[in-house]
């Protein structure tokens, strides 16, 4: 099986290590695995065989600026996402396993449109935080914010 993880980082931080731990286990079971990531940071040598970068540091910075100006987190990075999806189309994963989609590196609308075009793919989403369902607040309990329930 061909597995594609999508996460903000690869091999570093908590979610990056979770992805690489899963990748190693899946590979040991005979699967082919790639981890698409978007944030800068050095991918440790032993995990570079999995790593596929989405965009550049400049793309992330532009997405962050767009987010600050227009409150559109997750809707920037159109060119980077388009190029990544071209690569993913060629890779043809059997399973797409989503992790952290926030981090100014991928356009979620384009990503989900692509996923919808491939009903044959399995999709899993590990929710490491609350960003996906709160209007982009990853840790609402920590900051004691309940606005996401009515108007965020």
PLM region descriptions:
Residues 1-48, 91, 117-121:
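N-terminal subdomain of nucleotide-sugar transferases
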Residues 28-95:
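A conserved catalytic-core segment of Leloir-type glycosyltransferases
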Residues 63-68, 125-152:
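Acceptor-binding helix/loop patch of EC 2.4 sugar-transfer enzymes
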Residues 18, 109-114:
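A short acidic, amphipathic alpha-helical/loop segment
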Residues 12-14, 42-46, 104-107, 131-142:
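Short catalytic/ligand-binding loop motif for oxyanion handling, primarily in non-cytosolic enzymes
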Residues 85-106, 121-128:
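Short N-terminal targeting/anchoring amphipathic segment
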